[in-house]
Amino acid sequence: MNIIQQLEAEQAAKIEAKRTLPEFSPGDTVRVNVKVTEGNRTRVQAYEGVCIARSGGGLQENFTVRKISYGEGVERVFPVYSPMIESVDVVRRGKVRRAKLYYLRDRRGKSARIVEDTGVRARKLNDAERAAVAEEKARIDAEKVAAAQALAAEKAAAEAAEAKAAAEAAAAAETAAE
């Protein structure tokens, strides 16, 4: 492995640690949550459409998503490892026999539909995705519980310190009164 590939692998691993993208291919309907910065505000915008192509490799890998917005076809190219992509959700799996679905640009209506894939591979991928989402949710819930317990312990320690200080002040007042 040369130095460039090694650096790319390290960067890809760093980005994968922050967020993991599901396995998807051309023909799948995906929802891409993109961070949009307007002035000094940042918000998340969902872009849902059909993945019509995946190209490149390594850190330069891209995927193209096409949707019909107000009767007009809109395509957007997203880098897979972009920090602006918050998450990608697979809405449904498509059954296609091409790697590039550029022919959809010329189609309208029913001829532009993609048949849903209900095969074993699609079910396996969907089950794996659901398991990964459930695992991530369980991890986040565990973190929330741990944070709540730490906060409760901190509050209890603060209250105990206050009670101890009040008891010492009362004892000091009694000795001063005698």
From Swiss-Prot:
One GO term describing the cellular component: cytosolic large ribosomal subunit
GO biological process: translation
InterPro entries for the chain: Ribosomal_bL19, Ribosomal_bL19_CS, Ribosomal_bL19_sf, Translation_prot_SH3-like_sf
Domain of life (superkingdom): Bacteria
Signal peptide range: none
Family: Belongs to the bacterial ribosomal protein bL19 family.
Function of the molecule: This protein is located at the 30S-50S ribosomal subunit interface and may play a role in the structure and function of the aminoacyl-tRNA binding site.
Protein name (Swiss-Prot/TrEMBL): Large ribosomal subunit protein bL19
Gene name, Swiss-Prot/TrEMBL: rplS
